[in-house]
């Protein structure tokens, strides 16, 4: 597998490379190109710079019976989730509700595989993460909010879970970057140029511009 070999060659151990390459493969399979091979160069850059520890293992602890903490030790978030989710599920089944708080990790990646897996165990799942400012509120031209994606899933009897994953911007920044790479335009209302003008050019949004909130002005609230 290309992704796995590349990750190992740039500082990941076998388990980390296998975990991350599986996520990349599944994102490509599901049509989420912004979380597939597109992400590999950024992972390699982080590994080479030392920002990401490709051999780290998270430390999992219980703050309360319902609160699980995962210190990622500068690993990639998929590794943290691999170790943290079993403890989260166990705590939720024992107490009725539980939270997993993650620190010191890099790039949450796609979140729906994890919320879907939790829902397949009969639990309702909700996940969220923050992102650097990239979204301007309605009427503004400077970024204030992150794209701050969320994902949720819930089980259904004798049916696959309902699963939802979205950025709280008009579009995920990764999708804008993919559109730029492939030469596609984006819908009007996706974002603004660095001068605050509406544009359908993803390059003008990704390179110094800003995204707009999902749902137009209502998304600013």
List each language-model region with its residue ranges.
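Phosphate/diphosphate-binding glycine-rich loops and adjacent basic-rich segments that engage nucleotide
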Residues: 135-205
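Internal helical hairpin/lid segments
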Residues: 209-221
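A generic, well-ordered mixed alpha/beta core segment in the N-terminal half of proteins
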Residues: 67-157
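Generic N-terminal amphipathic, Lys/Arg-enriched alpha-helix
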Residues: 1-10
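Short, well-structured alpha-helical segments
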Residues: 14-25
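Secretory-pathway/luminal and periplasmic proteins that interact with or process carbohydrate-rich
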Residues: 28-34
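Active-site cofactor/substrate anionic-group-binding motifs, chiefly glycine-
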Residues: 35-89
